[in-house]
Amino acid sequence: MNKNSFSGGLRKRRTLKKDKKNLPLVSIITVVLNNKKFLEQSINSVLNQEYKNHEHIIIDGKSTDGTVEILRKNNSKIDYWISQKDRGIYDAMNKGIKLSRGSLIVMLNSDDVFYKHALKIATSYFNRYKNIDF
């Protein structure tokens, strides 16, 4: 991390999540750039999941609209977030993937929300069909 970036979240406090028996860790990656209008709804949809063994990683492309303030406000609810200039959405997604620790990786756009059963359903299929790539 350089002087032109900010970061935070539970990992900064050395709180790491991992797979549990029959409960794979799901890494949820959200990429955002100047979308403070919807970001908090997206964060809350992750927090409201029935399936709790997940981590939320948010990669911000150095927003200027107040997005970082939303991230700071939710610092204790997000596993890891960083705000730094990137080379576009795919660069940001790749950063998120490199930071992920889960057996499953899910992309959640910053203006989207999860239905509360989404991760529970996805992980049940993941556990049931071991030979299928999702």
What is the meaning of each model-derived region?
Residues 1-134:
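Nucleotide-sugar donor-binding/catalytic module of glycosyltransferases
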